[in-house]
Amino acid sequence: MVVSKSSPLIFERSREGRYAYSLPQSDIKTDSVESILDDKFIRKNKAEFPEVAELDLVRHYTELSNKNFGVDSGFYPLGSCTMKYNPKINEKVARIPGFAESHPLQEEGQVQGSLEIVYSLQEELKEITGMDEVTLQPAAGAHGEWTALMIFKAYHLDNGEGHRDEVIVPDSAHGTNPASASFAGFKAVTVKSNERGEVDIEDLKRVVNENTAAIMLTNPNTLGIFEKNIMEIREIVHEAGGLLYYDGANLNAIMDKVRPGDMGFDAVHLNLHKTFTGPHGGGGPGSGPVGVKKELASYLPKPMVIKDGDTFKYDNDIKNSIGRVKPFYGNFGIYLRAYTYIRTMGAEGLREVSEAAVLNANYIKASLKDHYEIPYEQYCKHEFVLSGSKQKEHGVRTLDMAKRLLDFGVHPPTIYFPLNVEEGMMIEPTETESKETLDYFIDAMIQIAEEAKNDPDKVLEAPHSTIIDRLDETTAARKPVLKFDNLHEEKE
């Protein structure tokens, strides 16, 4: 038998008349669909679902799952994504029946345990971030950004400063920052980085004005560099009447070392699915809690979960609230995982997490500095950016090297981001990887650098060992084939 590396689609396995279920004859009189629904809601043709037996169905998806790659499969140094190992105790707690089988519409008295988790997590995150109040409602990072910006907008309006319609973002910022600003009705204004990869203070003074609503920053920033002038940045923006927003994407570098609230930030979002080991990838679920200083607390989404004596309950009496931003109260399963992680680690453990994340990143950076261009030479925090400009001289681009890494069983780092580094490759090893894993990755990167110089075709034609060879990504982006019918049309 010839074994193919690729798998047929579930539609290609379909055979008319096969099915994967067996139901008894109904003994209840039922009406026809036609007698219930208007004709316009009834299909004219049979839905083209695949027809397969249960065994074929199970084998198909088992085969696909075995071809997936995740943190449990191998090293995943995807910069700015904090692809750390997710402890399995988190899953055990999330599956406790009292939590897993609860419903958001149950009466408060029936879900006191769940509400206590929500309240306790709010309190933990307040302490970690240095904020005065926290809402868990937002479903992800960008959702948290938007929520905080809507709070800023309401605050400025209430203070008679609705003209403040500009949000400052660094040229190294996450793409979600300007996107969230735009979505919230603001104009994004770029501030340049200096030669050290930090916010250029003089340029910041130039762009700040009476229309400044806020500045959005990560610290450490997207280049993995700590903004050592953060207190001066705070003073400049606050004096202009603006607010400071902390993008929590890089919090993994500073836990129990320094808090956003102590740096002068007025609001912060966190990624529970990154820093606090909620599983992520595949589109979710995520969680992007938002913390604020007391001046902004009355604008938080409602309801909040509060403690009244020995009882936990929803509080809808938030006078200036921007309203609900998520049905029910967000993604509760992620709260359970994050709370389990925080309680398991404790303050000392979270500090060690950040120390190990920073150590691992600097170890890789120092090991690769003689083989790749390092645009910013100072110590990094949890991640760093290198450049493939040396390899480009031999006709090999960062994309090619990322493809070659697949042959080593390593997920490629983030590439071509941030945009202000030529042929950039952003590497974030996280704290959970061993020295042996780091050394394996370093050796692979050094080998690829040598191949780019001495045997470039080997890199240009990579990957060689994956199930699917190099894709035509340009055509895939411009002419995507998203329906099975289209596949037939393409073949014809």
Curated annotation (Swiss-Prot):
The modification N6-(pyridoxal phosphate)lysine is found at residue 274. It holds the Pfam family Aminotran_5. GO terms for cellular component: cytosol; glycine cleavage complex. InterPro entries: Aminotrans_V_dom, GcvPB, GDC-P_C, GDC_P, PyrdxlP-dep_Trfase, PyrdxlP-dep_Trfase_major, PyrdxlP-dep_Trfase_small. Its cofactor is pyridoxal 5'-phosphate. Its EC number is 1.4.4.2. The glycine cleavage system is composed of four proteins: P, T, L and H. In this organism, the P 'protein' is a heterodimer of two subunits. This is Probable glycine dehydrogenase (decarboxylating) subunit 2. It comes from Staphylococcus haemolyticus (strain JCSC1435).
